[in-house]
Amino acid sequence: MKLTAKEQERLTVFTAAEVARRRKERGVPLNHPEAVAYISDWCIERGRDGQSVAEIRSGASKLLGREDVMDGVPEMIDMIQVEPVFPDGTKLVTVHDPIRSDSVGSADDETTESEAATDGGDSAGTDE
């Protein structure tokens, strides 16, 4: 099997995210790389499913709360940027302050209109 550098990176993120999912299910607090991979993988998969950039940004900030990660991790992650492949091409998704004290909830809930604000320049609509 021959993989491009981008495909290898994607598999690395997926593998780290899978470790993070298993640890989270067991109640083990996630470290920095696990938390970033967990959120990044979720964003990438939602892009592939065709969700909008705004929906992904909104949902991603609800995935992990402070109680899900080790002490100090929220302060280390002020922003996560990923480039999911959407049905119409690759776009940049930026999630600011992805781990919030009030963030625990279901990210699969419907996004309200106020949460689904404009991209704010986060989409780079380039095809790959």
Curated annotation (Swiss-Prot):
Give the EC number. 3.5.1.5
Give me the reactions it catalyses: urea + 2 H2O + H(+) = hydrogencarbonate + 2 NH4(+)
BP GO annotations? urea catabolic process
Q: Where is this region: Disordered?
A: 97-128
List the keywords (alphabetical): Cytoplasm, Hydrolase, Plasmid
Cellular component, GO annotation: cytoplasm
Of which family is this protein a member?
Belongs to the urease gamma subunit family.
Q: What is this protein called?
A: Urease subunit gamma
